[in-house]
Design a protein with these regions (language model features):
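Conserved beta-strand-loop surface patch within small alpha/beta domains used
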Residues: 1-74, 82-128
Length: 128
């Protein structure tokens, strides 16, 4: 799977994660199957935001509602691993929704993943 994303958007997400490098940042990804068009930061409402993330339910429900009304297509989520790599954790896999992209930021890089047959597979992120 190949997915295009603007270099400026990748830089913005890396910068966002660097603002508070001890906590996981998270948000929503919008676009289509071949391109991430936009990302929206959402509050991390997890009980332990230093180790995990939970997208604010109201923000997620609003994104789904807007998509159903003809708004931007919600294609996935992003989050950071403050003390780890940009690879999915077992916790990520347990929460993963098939058909959605997972952009993970860690170790100064961003990598893109999707679930297939119960496992994460890395997507080729084409930065342009």
């Amino acid at each position: 799977m190949q997915v295009n994303i603007a270099a400026a958007l990748v830089e913005r997400l890396l910068s966002e994660a660097a603002v508070d490098p001890t906590r996981e940042v998270c948000g929503l990804l919008y676009g289509n199957e071949g391109r991430i068009e936009a990302a929206e930061w959402t509050p991390n409402v997890a009980d332990d935001p230093d180790r995990t993330f939970e997208i604010e339910p109201a923000a997620l429900f609003m994104a789904i509602r807007l998509e159903r009304q003809g708004g931007p297509r919600l294609i996935g989520h992003y989050h950071s691993h403050p003390n780890g790599s940009a690879e999915p954790s077992p916790r990520d896999l347990a929460a993963a929704e098939p058909g959605k992209l997972w952009l993970i930021i860690g170790g100064g890089q961003a990598r893109l993943w999707y679930v297939e047959a119960g496992a994460f597979r890395e997507a080729q992120m084409i930065i342009n």
